[in-house]
Amino acid sequence: MKRSMYAGRVREEHIGQEITLKGWVGRRRDLGGLIFIDLRDREGIMQLVINPEKVSAEVMATAESLRSEFVIEVTGQVAAREQANDKLPTGAVELNVTALIVLNTAKTTPFEIKDGIEANDDTRLRYRYLDLRRPEMLENLKLRAKVTHSIRNYLDELEFIDVETPFLSKSTPEGARDYLVPSRVNKGHFYALPQSPQITKQLLMNAGFDRYYQIVKCFRDEDLRGDRQPEFTQVDLETSFLTEQEIQDITEGLIARVMKETKGIEVTLPFPRVKYDDAMALYGSDKPDTRFDMLLQDLTEVVKGVDFKVFSEAPAVKAIVVKGAADNYSRKDIDKMTEVAKQYGAKGLAWVKVVDGELNGPVAKFLTGIQEELTTALALEDKDLVLFVADTLEVANATLGALRGRIAKELGLIDNDKFNFLWVVDWPMFEWSEEEGRYMSAHHPFTLPQEETAHELEGDLAKVRAIAYDIVLNGYELGGGSLRINQKDLQERMFKALGFSAEEANDQFGFLLEAMDYGFPPHGGLAIGLDRFVMLLAGEENIREVIAFPKNNKATDPMTQAPSTVALKQLEELSLQVEEDETSKTN
């Protein structure tokens, strides 16, 4: 029979109606001769009642054979429950079954289909089709669909044009490692899966599209963590003839629309703007979480005269004050934080506690002469814990920024119901890579430098500033963008500053440079990480929870066993040969 409605949508208004439902058996209970079934579909759970006095012996026998995750079809009359279940939207009603058909049986599942399961991640991914049956996973993906629907409607209203760009593109040397695709037709040549549609969307501006968007898959072969996947989705925008402020206004409007339509939250516009240098100085991060205080304090000048060379001779001394937390952290706890500090390059972590108006701790004796000044500078009160890092400014900022976030989580200082958006602006154009031993693009090599610093492209690259902007939500980089270079000579200077010879630049980006000979308009844009955005809206801590079929932290899929080996014939067609490593040879 035709399904009447979703099980999770049956309400009191349907009492007395005969309906047909289809779904999965969530739970079966036998009570006083009656059989109760929780029927589950994507919209929720509906209680079924099978009464032996009102159904045939065949229906009763079928009901007795039901097990969890059997797929069934039932017909019956909606009735009011004697005792309502306030925890379910369908809790005021039940279905008195008159007909029952088993559409398919099921083996015992490797974990219960319910929220809050204890299965490990690889088991969940191995049986992802079962994991996705769980209500919280269904809700996460329904939320994702609502977000993308809201985004499309908003951008369509603003006359953005949805244009698909190629997945088989050219490998470029900047950024993360590419996923390469060998060409069978062009032996020895490779496509790259795009890390973003950056250049193609810029070329669409040159083509006169004016406003482009795409919700697009991107690929990066990089180390994984909770908010990264090898393939991910971004909301990609590009515009012509707009200022950075206008692009940011459009983006804020998009986010405000999504927040209202999916969470019922009105966000305050415009979002705060924080300069990059200020974000690093105050929060120790270029993606600051502003839901709590504990700002970094610069004490370099305050401690200059102390008889403690670690402080007095350090390039920078910075501190954070953990208010009222002196009793929360033992010496052993602080030793653990010291190990965290060392991971960020710090040589150690100094600390004092305020006890009965006095400073206590390993370095307290060196600070007695400046206790009053220190107390004023840090607004110290009894029971405060102060953590110091004496090192380069970069190390001090990064270390205390990491500790700030860790401590806030440990002490429950973060209001998880808050959504604090902000812009980080006035970025450096380049960042020094210890691994590469050179300056690299902080964003990408197509970012427009601020006019007043562009002359440093041939001088001190550390002084070049970009017209770039990142949007941050609760300590996560939600997205980033910039105005782009549209003048050929400036783009060539940028490539040269990054160490490209003219030949290398032409080999890698000649098509873009050539396009700049044909009236390339001023343009700029932005990309938002859709997976990360939905993760934060859903209150999850890993983007796997909002992606239907993600990879694990080894970039593999336990369900399909991808990546896998392929037949020798396939490799030969591609003129490829796999070399065994030494480990394989000895095993």
UniProtKB/Swiss-Prot annotation:
UniProt cross-references to Pfam families, sorted A to Z: GAD (PF02938), tRNA-synt_2 (PF00152), tRNA_anti-codon (PF01336)
Annotated GO MF terms: aspartate-tRNA ligase activity; ATP binding; catalytic activity, acting on a protein; nucleic acid binding; transferase activity
SS bond list: none
InterPro entries: Aa-tRNA-synt_II, aa-tRNA-synth_II, aa-tRNA-synth_II/BPL/LPL, Asp-tRNA-ligase_1, Asp-tRNA-ligase_1_N, Asp/Asn-tRNA-synth_IIb, AspRS_core, GAD-like_sf
Superkingdom of the organism of origin: Bacteria
EC numbers for this chain: 6.1.1.12
GO cellular component, one term: cytoplasm
Family as reported in the entry's similarity comment: Belongs to the class-II aminoacyl-tRNA synthetase family. Type 1 subfamily.
Protein function: Catalyzes the attachment of L-aspartate to tRNA(Asp) in a two-step reaction: L-aspartate is first activated by ATP to form Asp-AMP and then transferred to the acceptor end of tRNA(Asp).
Protein name: Aspartate--tRNA ligase
Organism: Streptococcus pneumoniae (strain Taiwan19F-14)
Lineage, opening ranks: Bacteria, Bacillati, Bacillota, Bacilli, Lactobacillales
